[in-house]
Amino acid sequence: MDLIASRRYQPDAEEPAKIDCIMMPVSAGLGAFLEGEMFQQIQVPASSVPAGAEFGIYVSGDSMEPRYHSGQIVWVKRCEELECGDIGIFVYDDCGYLKKYDEHTPDKSQAEFFTDSYGVVHNQPVLVSLNTKYSPILISPEQRFEVVGKVLN
């Protein structure tokens, strides 16, 4: 019996989306090195890509469980700043991270590094894992730190 002719089965009419994906995974653990942007175009169901996503990147590690899992693709919109609580992709000390962004008042030993020319002490960025077995990463002003983008899924 032909299932399509019987109308008991309808093939998926959704066109696949073609989107860039960085093939080197970002760490959801202790950090993985991101060597430049190694993009490859992949095809995925269009409904799986959130509106505004500019690229995908694979997750490596368990520090963002239970929300994100190793091998999963997260969809990212490029940006240079995030709000506290946003999940993002970051480069810190030449390693790529998938973490929740937060900010803390720097301790006294670090305060001078976060003080601007007007004497205003700014908050210290902190990268937080969702898996509580991992400690937060306090961002040192002496290391390169970059917000790559916001995770949309």
Question: Across the structure, where does each feature detected by a protein language model lie?
Answer:
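Short beta-strand/loop turn elements enriched in aromatics
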Residues: 25-62
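Structured loops at beta-to-helix junctions and adjacent beta-edge loops in soluble globular domains
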Residues: 22-24, 130
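Helix-turn-helix-like N-terminal two-helix hairpins of bacterial/phage DNA-binding regulators
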Residues: 1-14
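N-terminal cationic amphipathic segment used for targeting or macromolecule association
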Residues: 2-3, 26, 86, 127
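Helix-turn-helix/homeodomain-like alpha-helical modules used for DNA recognition
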Residues: 11-19, 31
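Acidic/glycine-rich C-terminal interaction modules and beta/coil loop segments
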Residues: 47-153
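Short, flexible coil/linker elements and helix-boundary hinge sites characteristic
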Residues: 7, 38-43, 119, 142
